[in-house]
Amino acid sequence: MSEPEVTYSTVRLHKSSRLQKLVRHEETQGPREAGYRKCSVCWQLIVKALGILCFLLLITVAVLAVKIFQYGQHNQEIHETLNYHHNCSNMQSDFNLKEEMLTNRSIDSRPGNELLESLNREQNRGYSETKTDLDSSQDTGTGVKYWFCYRTKCYYFIMNKNTWSGCKQNCQHYSLPLVKIDDENELKFLQFQVIPDSYWIGLSYDKEKKEWAWIDNGQSKLDMKIRKMNFKPGGCVFLSKRRLEDTNCKNSHYCICGKKLDKFPH
């Protein structure tokens, strides 16, 4: 009896074209997604770095702006101080010129020389009278710091903050009124003296007349300038190194009293 024949065969499964494309797509998609993730991380780092850089630039610009502003203010103060010294120098030069003219005229005219001496004596006498009046007044704890005379006026600085009415009473104690500023030159001179504080002066709002008035009800060459300042009715005026300013009369500032030496011979 013969043995049966055994037949072997190999079975090959052919993938469809669609399945092959899907496999190829999956094989290529993996590296692409990995590349995209790497690029995304890089961009995030770049954006963060740019954000930090912009923030630092903003801070730098802000600091520079503050420095420039402070530098401008400092230059303005220096300019104002130089202008004041220039004005004071001009005023002193004018005074010296007038004095020199009178002195020169005294060579040819004795009356001119006598007039000059009389003016000097009268101013010195007024200075002495003011000093005597102030020294003879009893100290009431008003914090008087210093006083001085300039040109035709003597000024008394009371370094104790008070209301406008309080400063008025303190000045009256020394037989003086709150200071009246007569012109622009006197204003600039006093502004240089009050650095860096603020002081009440003899200017307040008269509710009956409904206008700003000096304490002696007199006139000043500053009246036109004061009207242009548009002060609010009902207040009082104080002086600082930069300006005249109106405020509530019950606020506290230092005081300036003043006396005019107006007893000159005719």
Swiss-Prot record:
Annotated S-S bridges: 149-154, 167-255, 171-257, 236-249
Transmembrane segment boundaries: 45-66
Bilayer disposition of the protein: Single-pass type II membrane protein
Any GO CC annotation of this UniProt entry: plasma membrane
Chief localization: membrane
Annotated GO MF terms: carbohydrate binding
Keywords: Cell adhesion, Disulfide bond, Glycoprotein, Lectin, Membrane, Receptor, Signal-anchor, Transmembrane, Transmembrane helix
Compartments, record wording: Membrane
InterPro entries the UniProt entry points to: C-type_lectin-like (IPR001304), C-type_lectin-like/link_sf (IPR016186), CTDL_fold (IPR016187), Ly49_N (IPR013600), Mouse_KLRs (IPR052013), NKR-like_CTLD (IPR033992)
Entry keyword Nucleotide-binding: no
UniProt superkingdom: Eukaryota
Entry-listed glycosylation sites: 87, 104
Gene3D superfamilies in the cross-refs: Mannose-Binding Protein A, subunit A
The protein's assembly and partners: Homodimer; disulfide-linked.
PANTHER family: KILLER CELL LECTIN-LIKE RECEPTOR 2, KILLER CELL LECTIN-LIKE RECEPTOR 3-RELATED
Reported function: Receptor on natural killer (NK) cells for class I MHC.
Name this polypeptide is given: Killer cell lectin-like receptor 6
Name of encoding gene: Klra6
